[in-house]
């Protein structure tokens, strides 16, 4: 999906669910990591996370677009556009837009595991973060630690 297709999709969703046109720019922002999309208050543009489209498809993207359009139309009309505002929550329910998007699964962060073993008592420590073996010792016997397995 390219920039023109996403612009067309946002305009169609705006007319279909809100009955009002979307008169600004919609685009993908590949730098977004943890959020599905964002509405920019100063320019009234909408930025969407391309990775959500890759992972979950068009249906999830339409939900994110509806959520951001709720911010857009409420802000344009001068009503409460923030997540905590009653107007925003009511409009979300009316257009069946999700309040939160699905959780982004980051495979590379979950896989990395370090296994350390004490050289004296052979106690094993499983860690997600790497530790400095010159600085840290075994908590049981104060023996030296050795990295035995690193999975990534």
Curated annotation (Swiss-Prot):
One of its GO terms (cellular component) is cytoplasm. InterPro entries: SprT-like_domain, SprT_Zn_ribbon, Uncharacterised_SprT-like. The active site is at 68. Zn(2+) binds at residues 67, 71. The keyword Oxidoreductase does not apply. The keyword Transferase does not apply. It is found in: Cytoplasm. GO terms for molecular function: zinc ion binding. Keywords: Cytoplasm, Metal-binding, Zinc. Its main location: cytoplasm. Binds 1 zinc ion. Residues 7-148 form the SprT-like domain. It comes from the Bacteria. It holds the Pfam family Zn_ribbon_SprT. Its cofactor is Zn(2+). Belongs to the SprT family. This is Protein SprT-like. It comes from Bacillus cereus (strain 03BB102).
């Amino acid at each position: 999906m390219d920039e023109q297709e996403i612009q067309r999709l946002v305009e169609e969703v705006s007319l279909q669910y809100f009955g009002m046109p979307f008169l600004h720019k919609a685009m993908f922002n590949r730098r977004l990591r943890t959020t599905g999309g964002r509405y920019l208050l100063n320019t009234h543009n909408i930025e969407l996370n391309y990775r959500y489209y890759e992972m979950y498809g068009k249906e999830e993207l339409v939900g994110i677009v509806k959520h951001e359009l709720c911010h857009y139309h409420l802000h344009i009309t001068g009503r409460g556009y923030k997540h905590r505002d009653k107007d925003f929550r009511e409009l979300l329910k009316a257009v069946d837009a999700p309040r939160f998007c699905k959780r982004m699964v980051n495979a590379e962060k979950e896989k990395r595991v370090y296994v350390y073993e004490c050289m004296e008592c052979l106690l094993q420590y499983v860690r997600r973060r790497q530790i400095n073996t010159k600085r840290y010792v075994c908590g049981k016997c104060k023996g030296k630690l050795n990295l035995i397995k690193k999975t990534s």
